[in-house]
Amino acid sequence: MRRDEIQSLLDNIPVTPESMCSYFADRPSQSRAFRVDGDLPPELFDVALDRGYRRCGDIYYQQTCKHCHLCLSYRVLVQSFVARRSQRRVAVRNSDVEWRVVEPVLTSEKEALYLRYQHSQHYVKDIARPDAERFAAAGYDEASLLDTLEFQMYTNPRSTRELQLHCDGQLLGFGTLDLSANAVSAVYFVFDPDHARRSLGTMAILAGLDWAREREIQYYYLGFYIPGHPKMDYKRHFKPAEIRDPVAGKWIGAPDAEIAALAD
């Protein structure tokens, strides 16, 4: 199948009904999505990434909201990337951290770290109560969260890899990297909340970019950049980069002025 035929197929997948947006509670969300049982050929995955698709478990999806276009696919130009001063400081701060890219294997250590990370990011802190009690008070239980972990980070194509950060034998963070023919797509990253001052999310991106550069990979996809969003705005600091205009369906350079224009 030719590239243009694949593009046409992806662009004509039916749009899902409206559901609650994960980023803005007052807005509906819609997407195109398809499920893959097994591996997606790298060349086809390249086209899907280029069309703004991402993967979660065995589902590939593209945001197609009618009245909001703030979820901007963002990719760093790997071979041209230059770390900012603040990013270089993060690298120095983590000079004692060893990073490695390996095949993903779920362990009890990762399960425990995932639960602690989710609680620190999404639930009210109450250090006087055990984790299980805090999750229950927030309306979640550990079993359902661990099911999400397995689906989100360990239901993967065979080409998927895991980025790990270690210090003195301790696992500080781990994340899922999807590989296509000419790109890396960062799916999800988890870090130890006790080491928040290390800026491990930034460190993981820097490590992933180094790994991609060594392999002469062209693009490093950071997922959705949402201008001004407290959890999704940081991606604009990794440049040079391109953003995908969700209306025109084309990739453009990502200086701040053009990002602001798309956000309006």
For the regions a language model picked out, list residue spans one by one.
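A structural signal for well-ordered alpha-helical segments within the folded catalytic domains
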Residues: 42, 108, 202-206
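A conserved beta-strand-loop-helix scaffold within acyl/acetyltransferase catalytic domains
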Residues: 59-67, 73-197
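Terminal substrate-recognition subdomain of acyl/acetyltransferases
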Residues: 1-106, 214, 218-264
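Noncatalytic linker/hinge segments flanking ATPase motor cores
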Residues: 117-118, 139-141, 203-207, 215-221, ...
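Aromatic (often tryptophan-rich) hydrophobic motifs at membrane interfaces
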Residues: 163-244
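Short C-terminal domain-edge/linker segments immediately following a structured domain
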Residues: 104, 129-135, 194-195, 205-209, ...
